[in-house]
From Swiss-Prot:
Its cofactor is prenylated FMN; Mn(2+). It catalyses: a 4-hydroxy-3-(all-trans-polyprenyl)benzoate + H(+) = a 2-(all-trans-polyprenyl)phenol + CO2. Keywords: Cell membrane, Decarboxylase, Flavoprotein, FMN, Lyase, Manganese, Membrane, Metal-binding, Ubiquinone biosynthesis. NCBIfam families: PRK10922.1, UbiD family decarboxylase. The active site is at residue 290. This is 3-octaprenyl-4-hydroxybenzoate carboxy-lyase. Mn(2+) binds at residues 175, 241. Pathway: Cofactor biosynthesis; ubiquinone biosynthesis. Catalyzes the decarboxylation of 3-octaprenyl-4-hydroxy benzoate to 2-octaprenylphenol, an intermediate step in ubiquinone biosynthesis. The gene is ubiD.
Length: 493
């Protein structure tokens, strides 16, 4: 893997600007709806990251569309192109289940990976850029930050790219997660985390171990790209997001202790919110336009009280919006798809490709191609996808095809479904499984069904009929026509 040349978000923006991948907008633009519309049009056109230098009513610039193309996601991970993200996936697969060296030569081959692991511990600083300016007590005022109000029916401005830092009572390592946060007032936010996410689990364990005590929380905004992407990558449970960021970056992640608690935050973050969650303090969150393309339901979530705001001089507020794909989460999903393939292949070597179509809201539908080896094999792979990584807990549909099908070509996939499937025999239905809270199509919030589709050629034991043979032109004729094709001049120049 390549080492990055940027230590913080500003270094990355300098690189993007040099490559023509950042557009500075000096025109006055309103964080209320206007930024969303501009960012959405830009993303759909494959355009650059946007730095709104003159937000209406604010002096702090707003960064949007940072990871609006898969290529910029790859750059953020220190890779030259999207395909190189396979290397990131191979490293994660190795860390998830490391293979012992089989001999001296194999040890030499594995040395680069072991060397990268040395960059995993964090580097703790006594002073840091993220604490150059400090607001405490009555000076804490979230309304001074140009937090975007993304859609007309949204309940309030919404923080979208905050890295929430928590630690459970019995854990050495911290958890970094990205959870949206509704603004309630000048020092109050609603922390919308689902019950299975790391931050929520830390909070549950804290409440059991320290009933009635305040739970420390920090939220970092505008961290370096390796740390941001580390928070959205399917890393092993035993590996911290800071450690993974160190692997990506090629050197240790620099952190600093919060002023009000013992949590450690990215030293180069643009803004850090410190505070606590009071057990039992809840508030109705939503509705908000989400990555599904719909407004979600209102539900109760914990309230995060902000006691300190620390920030860099001339801080930049990093933001995004979510909406019907494509949006920034969908683009991230396309890029991270390349990371997932080697991780799955480590556990299931028969898998040839794995694809999460962005129009399927990034994770709700998966297409798998495989080298089938025995009757019922496709169903085993379905179950494996649903159970191996918790990222696929909410995947509603899994389609399994043979390796002669291109998982990323709907023409191929639909042909396989319509010619190789019997709806009753080849469909697996499961009820009462975990489903995304945002999926209003499920009969009960958080609980719904899943469908697996076996679109592979059927083997003896799976069918009693003679199976069809695909039509393929003879290689001799194809070669002959290749030679005379230009002379035929059928399609013109």
């Amino acid at each position: 893997m390549n080492s990055m040349k940027y230590r913080d978000l500003r270094d990355f923006l300098t690189l993007l600007e040099h490559k023509g991948e950042l557009k500075r907008i000096s025109f006055e633009v309103d964080p209320y709806l206007e930024m969303t519309e501009i960012a959405d049009r830009t993303l759909r056109a494959g355009g650059p990251a946007l730095l709104f230098e003159n937000p209406k009513g604010y002096s702090m610039p707003v960064l949007c569309n940072l990871f609006g193309t898969a290529e910029r996601v790859a750059m953020g991970m220190g890779q030259k192109d999207v395909k190189a993200l396979h290397d990131v996936g191979k490293l994660l697969a190795f860390l998830k289940e490391p293979d012992p060296p089989k001999g001296f030569r194999d040890l030499l081959d594995k040395l680069p990976k072991f060397k990268q692991v040395l960059n995993m511990p964090t580097k703790r600083l006594n002073t840091a850029p993220c604490q150059e300016h400090v607001s405490v007590g009555d000076d804490v005022d979230l309304t001074r930050i140009p937090i975007m109000h993304c859609w007309p029916e949204d309940a309030a401005p919404l923080i979208t790219w905050g890295l929430t830092v928590t630690r459970g009572p019995n854990k050495e390592r911290q958890n970094l997660g990205i959870y949206r946060q509704q603004v309630l007032g000048k020092n109050k936010l609603i922390m919308r985390w689902l019950s299975h996410r790391g931050g929520a689990l830390d909070f549950q364990e804290w409440c059991q171990a320290h009933p009635g005590e305040r739970f420390p929380v920090a939220v970092a905004l505008g961290a370096d790209p390796a740390t941001i992407l580390g928070a959205v990558t399917p890393i092993p449970d035993t590996l911290s997001e800071y450690a993974f960021a160190g692997l990506l970056r090629g050197y240790k992640t620099e952190v600093v202790k919060c002023l009000s608690n013992n949590l450690e935050v990215p030293a180069s973050a643009e803004i850090v919110l410190e505070g606590y969650i009071e057990p039992g303090e809840l508030a109705p969150e939503g509705p908000y336009g989400d990555h599904t393309g719909y407004y979600n339901e209102i539900d109760m979530f914990p309230v995060f009280t902000v006691t300190h705001i620390t920030q860099r001089h001339d801080a930049i507020y990093h933001s995004t919006y979510t909406g019907r794909p494509p949006d920034e989460p969908a683009v991230l999903g396309v890029a991270l798809n390349e990371v997932l393939v080697p991780i799955l292949q480590k556990q299931f070597p028969e898998i040839v490709d794995f694809y999460l179509p962005p129009e399927g809201c990034s994770y709700r539908l998966a297409v798998v191609t495989m080298k089938k080896q025995y009757p019922g094999h496709a169903k085993r792979v379905m179950m494996g996808v649903w159970s191996y990584l918790r990222q696929f807990m909410y995947t509603k549909f899994v389609i399994v095809c043979d390796d002669d099908i291109n998982a990323r070509d709907w023409n191929d996939v639909i042909w396989a479904i319509t010619t190789r499937m019997d709806p009753v025999r080849d469909t697996v239905l499961m009820e009462n499984t975990p489903i995304d809270y945002l999926d209003f199509a499920s009969p009960v919030s958080g609980l719904g069904s899943k469908m697996g589709m076996d679109a592979t050629n059927k083997w003896l034991g799976e069918t009693q009929r003679e199976w069809g043979r695909p039509i393929v032109m003879s290689e001799e004729v194809r070669t002959r026509v290749d030679k005379i094709w230009d002379e035929l001049d059928i399609l013109g120049p």
